[in-house]
Structure formats: C-alpha cells, structure tokens
UniProtKB/Swiss-Prot annotation:
Pathway named in the protein's UniProt entry: Amino-acid biosynthesis; L-proline biosynthesis; L-proline from L-glutamate 5-semialdehyde: step 1/1
Protein name: Pyrroline-5-carboxylate reductase
Listed SUPFAM superfamilies: 6-phosphogluconate dehydrogenase C-terminal domain-like (SSF48179), NAD(P)-binding Rossmann-fold domains (SSF51735)
Gene Ontology BP annotations: L-proline biosynthetic process
GO molecular function, one term: pyrroline-5-carboxylate reductase activity
Role this protein plays: Catalyzes the reduction of 1-pyrroline-5-carboxylate (PCA) to L-proline.
UniProt keyword terms in alphabetical order: Amino-acid biosynthesis, Cytoplasm, NADP, Oxidoreductase, Proline biosynthesis
Matches recorded under PANTHER family: PYRROLINE-5-CARBOXYLATE REDUCTASE (PTHR11645), PYRROLINE-5-CARBOXYLATE REDUCTASE 3 (PTHR11645:SF0)
GO (cellular component) term, any one: cytoplasm
Organism lineage string: Bacteria, Bacillati, Bacillota, Bacilli, Bacillales
Stated family: Belongs to the pyrroline-5-carboxylate reductase family.
Subcellular localization(s) per the UniProt record: Cytoplasm
Catalytic activity, EC: 1.5.1.2
Organism annotation: Staphylococcus haemolyticus (strain JCSC1435)
Length: 271
C-alpha cells in the first residue's frame, strides 16, 4: 500500500508519525510533499526515513490513499496542481477542517472515493480520537483499510458528515482546550506559593494517574468524582467554587463556539 501526504503540517506529521510507529506500513511506502519548502521537507523526510517528491505524476500514479493535509485556504491551488494526474485508483483522505466532501470533489473534478477524518495531535503517541465520514462510493474493503490506518494512531468514531462539526469541537480541538485548563491549573497552583517546576511535574503526574483511573475503571467519571468527594471536605469546597463560576456553561460555550466556527468554514468556499 502506498500513501501520499500533501501537506506536512502539525496534524499531518502526527498522523504519519503514528502510522510509522505502528509499523503497519514500511516507511518507503509513505511519500511526503508540501507547497514549496523543499529543504524543510527533505530534512523531515530523512528524519522519518520516508520518501519525498514534488513530481505529482509520480506520486499519484500508483498511490492507494492520498492524504489531503494542506491549509483549507490553500486547497484550491493544491487541487489545480494534482488534478491532471489523478487516476481511478486514487482514494482521498482529507484532514482539512471545514471542507465538505462535495466541495473537495468539485475542486478535484473527480468522483473518486473521499473520506474526511478529524484526528487530533495525540495521533503522534497513538492515542488520537478520530472522527471519520465516507463518501457514498467508498467500498467496504476500502473502508476497512482506512479504519485500519486510522486505528494505527488511535481510536475511530464513524459519523455522518454533518456530525463532524461536533467531533471537531469535542476531540479535534480537545487537546488544546485541555492544555489550556491544565495551564491555568499550573498558574493557580504556583500562586499558592509552590515552585512552578514542582507544580508542573505534580500536575503532569496527576493527569497521567487520573487518565489511567478513567481507563481502567468501569465507573463513570461522575461516579469516580463522587467517590473522592467527602461532604464538607476540601474537595467539596473546591468543587463548590467551580460551581459558582458555572464551569458547565463555560465548556458549553467553548464547544459551541468551535462547532459554530467549523460550520462557518464549511460554508465558506474561500477558506
């Protein structure tokens, strides 16, 4: 199986690092290309031990899956660049936020099978949660192959394309939202008088330990919280303070804003 990546940004890098680390494919079956920065592309390809090229005809002639990972606003130029060399065996996997399948097909001027995936940067460590939607002409075997590829860097949620907006908000942008929460936790802990490096290390291990508890327990997160919250204790006092600031409403606003922006991008052909 030959994979070609158009675009080598942060998300694309996380994906092909995840695939390489999974050893599902040999590195010489993965090809990278970008818009113009050949030196950076060469260095990165050599670092990973994968191939790189700017010869679109060569890249596409026997490519099984073509990952579209350019910036959404660059896609029209990418489509014009590769359209003459697309063949019927190419299947496309888009990681471009906000661009619907029908728009991608229009720009490529083809009816080849197209999947849209919305991973997150945890793909780099094999723990992305990836939403995926398929065009109607994606066959069962091809779906299985794509799911197998995506499972190489985490877990998969297959949804209707309209629901990718919600997946984008919850899991696609999720790592950034959680990093921001942890960042504020570090600042608040440092304000209590502890050294910043002590607080950062403590919270890092707190996050790891709590994640393992969630992973290994059959209990809901709500029940896990209740199990360590004693009436009148310190944990209850802190939770009461969070409730006064309506943390539930804060997260709803956060996710709704991300969904709204994803919908906006999908309606804007000038992305």
């Amino acid at each position: 199986m030959k994979l070609v990546f158009y675009g080598a940004g942060n998300m694309a890098q996380a994906i092909f690092k995840g695939i390489i680390n999974s050893k599902k494919l040999k590195s010489h079956d993965i090809y990278l290309t970008n818009k113009s920065n050949e030196e950076a592309l060469k260095n990165f390809a050599e670092e990973l031990g994968v191939e790189y090229s700017y010869d679109d005809e060569k890249l596409l002639q026997d490519a099984d899956y073509v990952f579209l990972g350019s910036k959404p606003y660059d896609f029209e130029k990418v489509a014009q660049r590769i359209q003459p060399y697309i063949n019927e065996n190419n299947r496309f996997i888009s990681i471009m936020a906000g661009l619907p399948i029908n728009y991608i097909q229009e720009q490529l001027q083809v009816e080849n099978p197209i999947a849209r995936i919305m991973p997150n940067t945890n793909a780099q460590v094999g723990h992305s949660v990836t939403g995926i939607s398929f065009s109607g002409n994606f066959g069962p075997k091809s779906k299985e192959e794509v799911n197998d590829l995506v499972n190489a860097f985490g877990s998969v949620i297959e949804v209707d394309e309209d629901h990718l907006h919600q997946v984008t908000a919850i899991t696609g942008s999720g790592p950034a939202f959680l990093y921001h929460v942890f960042e504020q936790y570090v600042k608040a802990g440092t304000d209590l008088g502890l050294e910043k490096d002590q607080v950062e290390e403590s919270i890092k291990n707190l996050i790891i330990g709590t994640s393992k508890m969630i992973e290994r327990s059959d209990l809901s997160m709500e029940q896990l919280r209740k199990n360590i919250t004693s009436k009148g204790g310190t944990t209850q006092a802190g939770l009461n303070a969070l409730a006064q600031h309506d943390i539930e409403a804060i997260f709803k606003d956060c996710l709704n804003a991300a969904v709204h922006r994803s919908v906006e991008l999908s309606k804007n052909e000038d992305n």
